[in-house]
């Protein structure tokens, strides 16, 4: 009986040990499967994250290039506009320099000579130009100056003059600003070709 108990104990130990080893093998196998699944998922997630990061980096690069191109275009446009503005200022200054009293006198006399003799006209000038030119124009235009032609001072004109039909809507603008604007519009297409940067 003692052998039977011993055999029984040995059998229980052996069965328990076998069961424990079987259970341990299953646990290890399950752990290996879980570990492999975790590794596969981690690798898959890593690939997905890498692809997403590469995609975002590519999009960022494209957006950066587009932003850079736009910045360059804006810079070119701003530079062209600044150069045009400087050109326009220089043109206005040059035209204003030409508009001295002698030039104004000659221009007014020519315009008055070709204007219809029966029309009454007003010549609108800067206040200082009126006082400087009045006596010279009296000599050249004669008796028409008070009757058919009247000189009118106007603070809004810096250089040059305007001629207007009295009691009419027709007028011609010979101010330095207007002449410079007309010249600028005429020269602008050629000027654009000169400063064309891109």
From Swiss-Prot:
InterPro entries per UniProt: ATPase_V1_Esu
Family: Belongs to the V-ATPase E subunit family.
Official protein name in the record: V-type proton ATPase subunit E
One GO process term, biological-process aspect: proton motive force-driven plasma membrane ATP synthesis
Function, as annotated: Produces ATP from ADP in the presence of a proton gradient across the membrane.
Keywords from the named record: ATP synthesis, Hydrogen ion transport, Ion transport, Transport
Lineage, highest ranks first: Bacteria, Pseudomonadati, Spirochaetota, Spirochaetia, Spirochaetales
Source organism, top-level taxon: Bacteria
GO CC terms, sorted: proton-transporting two-sector ATPase complex, catalytic domain
Annotated GO MF terms: ATP binding; proton-transporting ATP synthase activity, rotational mechanism; proton-transporting ATPase activity, rotational mechanism
């Amino acid at each position: 009986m003692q052998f039977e108990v011993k055999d029984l104990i040995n059998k229980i130990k052996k069965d328990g040990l076998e069961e424990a080893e079987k259970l341990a093998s299953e646990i290890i196998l399950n752990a290996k499967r879980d570990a492999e699944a975790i590794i596969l998922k981690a690798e898959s997630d890593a690939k997905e994250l890498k692809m997403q990061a590469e995609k975002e980096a590519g999009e960022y690069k494209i957006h950066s290039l587009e932003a850079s191109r736009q910045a360059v275009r804006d810079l070119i446009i701003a530079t062209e506009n600044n150069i045009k503005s400087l050109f326009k200022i220089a043109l206005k200054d040059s035209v204003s320099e030409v508009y001295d009293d002698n030039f104004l006198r000659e221009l007014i006399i020519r315009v008055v000579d070709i204007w219809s003799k029966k029309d009454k006209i007003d010549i609108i000038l800067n206040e200082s130009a009126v006082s400087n030119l009045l006596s010279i124009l009296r000599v050249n235009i004669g008796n028409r100056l008070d009757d058919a032609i009247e000189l009118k001072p106007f603070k809004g004109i810096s250089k040059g003059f305007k001629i207007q039909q009295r009691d009419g809507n027709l007028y011609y603008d010979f101010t330095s600003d207007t002449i410079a604007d007309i010249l600028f519009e005429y020269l602008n297409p050629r000027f654009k070709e000169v400063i064309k940067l891109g």
